[in-house]
Amino acid sequence: MSAALLPSPPRRIVVLAFDGVDAGIVQTMMAGGRLPNLTALKTRGGFSPLTPPVPPQTPVSWTSFSTGLDPGGHQIFDFLKRDPSDMTPTFAVAQDREVPFLLGRKTPAAAAAAVGTILLLPAAVLAGRGRRLAAAVLFLIAAGAAAAAFAAARAWLPATRPSIESNRRGTTFWSEAVARPATVMRMPVTFPPESFPRGRLLSGLGVPDLSGRIGKPAYYTSDPFFAPREGNDFSIEIVRLESNVGRQTTRIVGPPGRAFGRAGAIELPVTLSVSPSRDRLSIEAGGSRLTLSAGQWSDWTSLAFRVNPLITVHGYARFLLETIAPEIALYVSPVQFDPERLPPGFDISAPPGYAKELLRRFGRYKTMGWAIDTWSIQSGTLSEPAFLQDVAATVAQDRRMLRALVKEDRRLLVHYFEFPDRVAHVFWRFRDPKHPAYDAALAARYGDVVEKSYETMDAIVGETARALPPDAALLVLSDHGFATWRRSVNYDSWLVEKGYLVLRGNAQRQNLEALFSRGAFWEAVDWSKSRAYAMGLGDVYVNLRGREKDGIVAPGADYEKLRDELSRGLLELTDPKTGEHAVSRVFKRENVYRRYDPRLIPDLIVANRPGYRVSWQASLGVPTGSVFEDNRDVWSGDHCSLDPDLVRGVFFASRPFSSSQVPGITDATAALRALLSGKASPGPIVWR
């Protein structure tokens, strides 16, 4: 199915990458006339549904697109992975490591030498001119200053600092010679940023907030009866205020103290003052002062966390005063890193100064990879209107950047938008009357929000298409589609029920904070009797001898027999409430990945039918006792553990193409590389 490219390769290519756009919804909306710009793009070039990889998760799918490899090849196979030496879950995208801070243990001596040298030079000059007394005084001052510098550096500068190393393997298409010069904006799994010739990149999913988390918002409340939804599984910083009137002092949590050899987190004192009329709240945080009325957002506010006299970590956040009476409800966004004052060695762009350049051109923007806060609306600390306001502000800033970047004469521009995915995750409940969290009154107001986010996408596509010259090519794609999540399934509970996972006590509930702080997992498991365990979003592992720390299943025939047995049992798993099978397919890793690390990649990958998804506790490896339970959560739509064929994304192109079958996302990579190089496309997407 290969053919020569006709006409010649486009001089410029723009790729708009939208997260979580579902092929079925797009086709329905195009048929109804609600997506005129995508319809025009389809007419001009072409459209096809796009199948995500196994599993259809955001970091997995976008990394497959970025590299053209399947998850076994690029090794980003889930949000979470485990270390087989102790089964501790960690984030799969990147791993922590320690690197020297400045010169490491030599820093104090270097500081002393630098200070001493600066002062000794004039002393030497004075001595040479015969002014011995003045020279002697300066020599003494130099010695004292050098000693003070040594002591200060030793006391206040750490020998090492935390760093992050990407787990992604493979070569990205934008780093190849045919793509240069290239600009890449916010693509997932691009942190830490990698420099490439004539390239500019702003990192996306993977960049933490100032606390070192994927995103840690805060909620300040004077309501003594407030309780976050779902037991605060997403680890919102809940701060209890002593009063709903007058003046009081609290704090904002900043960077982790362990980065600087301290226990706990670095905190910034904050003073809150309620006006006598109880219609305004004044906030003092370091050198920043602002006053808000109920329902008002602040601008980005500078926050400086002083670690010691030598180190200050700079960031900024937005405040939202949801209510002031009868009780204070103050939301503080995750604290973003300030691109103008990043910590030493911490880069969020390539080249390192590009993030600062963007800030100076466009103003402050969200540097955190998961930019839109979906945790607070789930926890009941952010309302639906406030969430949509945050989405609108985030999208508006990204569109400002895109409008300017698309005018630059560069061979390739890749621009990623996350908002369709984030909106669908938390507003799906209003478009599914059968969902346990469906609310008819709220559905009348928010039932069309997902479709409206698609209309926003369509508008972005339209303004981009109009800004491009006729000889440019425009590609629009998404990493996966979406489905309702009505019922949660816990594979660890099923493994316990069937005797594959043996407990010696009750398993403790876990949350994101335990994940970040390396909490204790699996304490209730008796590994000497357990043959299998589950973790992540559909990953099942055999407790394999020679791989797992306490593995008991022999490699070879016993391993294969157990995998077959588990696969049959999971395919037969029936929800007693609905009578439906929860599992669509069970994949063996060798059947979906061309190559893989057998110590890293799950032995089985379980794919759900629409309506079902792995529960949050199951993703952390916690058997809760119930195999099935209603999902009454705000997070009501999903894709992560579903069958990829049932949650397809989209692929549009301004150039005509044909396809012999429904392409996968790596086929889109191959087609893009063909456009860039001018060589024949290997198919199934063939340029006409």
Regions found by a protein language model. Give the residues of each.
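Beta-strand elements within well-structured catalytic alpha/beta cores of enzymes
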Residues: 10-27, 40-42, 65, 176-177, ...
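Secreted, luminal/periplasmic, and some membrane-associated catalytic domains
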Residues: 7-11, 18, 33, 43-51, ...
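Cytosolic-side transmembrane helix boundary signature
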Residues: 114-140
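Conserved alpha/beta core surface patches that mediate binding of polyanionic ligands
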Residues: 408, 517-525, 628-636
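Active-site-surrounding "flap" and adjacent substrate/cofactor-binding loops of secreted or lumenal enzymes
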Residues: 34-38
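A long, amphipathic alpha-helix that forms part
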Residues: 2-8, 24-26, 388-413, 423, ...
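Low-complexity, glycine/alanine/valine/leucine- and proline-rich hydrophobic stretches
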Residues: 611-659, 668
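Short, solvent-exposed beta-strand-terminating loops
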Residues: 353-365, 417-430
